[in-house]
Amino acid sequence: MSENYYLRQNVQVEPLVDQWYAWPHLIPPATSARNITHRHFKIMDSYIAAPQIHANAVKNPKMLGGPFIDYGGKRVDEVRELRDRTKRDRANLIELSQAIESLDAMLRTSAKGYSLHPLYEKIPAPLRGYVELVYDLNHHPSFRLMEPLLYRSRYYDPSQQSMMLSTTSSDDRPFVLSTPRLESEDSLHLRLPFNSPVIDDLFRLKSTARPWNEIKDMLSTPDSQDNLLKMFLTPEAPPAYSPYTGPGVRWRYFGHACILIESQGISMLFDPVLSYTYENGISRYTYLDLPETIDYVLVTHDHQDHILFETLLQIRHKVKNIVVPRNNKGTLQDPSLKLLFQNCGFKNVIEIDELDEIQDGQVRITGLPFFGEHADLDIKSKMAWLARIGAHSLLFAADSCNIEPHLYEHLHRDLGDVDALFLGMECDGAPLSWLYGPLLTQKVERAMDESRRLSGSNCEQGMHIVNTFNCREAYVYAMGQEPWLNYIMSVKYTEQSRPITESNRLIETCKQRGIIAERLFGEKEILLEQKPPRAAAAPELISA
């Protein structure tokens, strides 16, 4: 009888789209097309022309997150081959990107407030039948993409998708969003689309062993890669998970914006971003600390540090429901998260609007408006989550920026007090073009770009939320400080960095008022068994 094997807990999984690290804008056809032509090609062309400039830039901490390929100036021929192959194999997406740009230009010159009907004949051929032309109430022209149809068209090709397996033993990992993943001797490249059930079977091996021959057949790997595949397997069983069975609520912080709540047999996981298991000086929860079944995964928004396919694909087999905010249907900058997850093989995707609720026993989850942090773009697929479990209430506001304090006053009048606030305070976010640049069809002025940033709340804005909801606890999170997040985050704080000084002031202000406050880092566990009496909170904003 063949020996049974588990997947090792330190197997690193990189989901790829045409060998680029997969993040939410690389999967919907329209945003994928724009990123290929206006991000990937630009980076590859630059590297081919001047590889040493890239090699020097990646050594400079100030350049972290910039458009530089991290291969030390080497492997230029492989990058050139990838570029040329992409141009050949993704000609449809290149045409789609060009058509989006041409359509935008046509509307700017031809749509002057009169009927748009005659302009349908001028729509570029790749977009005919996939867009509706519209005005807003001020007669500004735009178009609405038929996104469900695009997923069923020649513009969506799951064969673009694959997974690269390797092993990791430390938090030291290069930034991945600007460097394509090339083949290497110690990596196993699995040509699996993200909706493949084989992916679920693969990650079930983390807790359920199978014979070698079944694993090999499942992955369809050639005999020449047997030794490599065996490096990722072990006969040793992982430790069993102990679910929380107490009478109240347990929440655990896994790093960044990832928090697991367990109560009365129901589990909720917010913005899953998990570390692998290996010996390291910083204590953390990992995949080993997840329950066998996760009732609800809740996503706040579609930035790459909140929707991490590297984590989500590994836990998909555990997830009963994934809850996402509803988008502005048909806009380029706001692709549907429901369609995204459905096309990536997730079942039971629940799309909810602001103030919609999910009720499951004594658990109520309410979607709350999320302002800011999206460079003033008209993006609706962002949501804060209010979780009420019996007498307890926790508000996960993610990167919400309190640019309109009256919003929270209206919400408090409707929803009442909240026990604990979780708030991101990256108040010096990247400019508009860093994330959304490929979607823009016109050059943005530098001053305009710098003024529109992906920024969260500062101290004054955060304290207003604490005061408005009479919070007893305030936790700063989603700061990207955990070292195992370096590969997707481009922040390197010092004690003088504004997000640190602003969050320090918020924490100190809260403590002076008897409010429990902390900037979360690494791991934390809190048990909520009996609700303590509420401490009075000052009704007026304490200014920073």
Region locations from a protein language model:
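Short acidic, glycine/proline-enriched helix-loop-strand junctions
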Residues: 443-444, 448-454, 458, 464-465, ...
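Metallo-beta-lactamase
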Residues: 224-244, 327-392, 508, 512, ...
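Active-site HxH/HxHxD metal-binding segment of metal-dependent hydrolases
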Residues: 285-353
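Active-site-proximal loop/helix segments of hydrolase catalytic cores
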Residues: 310, 371-468
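Active-site-proximal beta-strand elements of phosphoester/diester hydrolases
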Residues: 250-253, 267-272, 364-371, 393-399
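Pre-active-site segment of Zn-dependent metallo-hydrolases
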Residues: 2-200, 231-246, 254, 258-302, ...
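Active-site neighborhood of phospho(di)ester-bond hydrolases with catalytic His/Asp-centered motifs
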Residues: 269-272, 293-307, 323-327, 395-400, ...
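Active-site environment of divalent metal-dependent phosphoester hydrolases
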Residues: 277, 303-307, 329-332, 356-359, ...
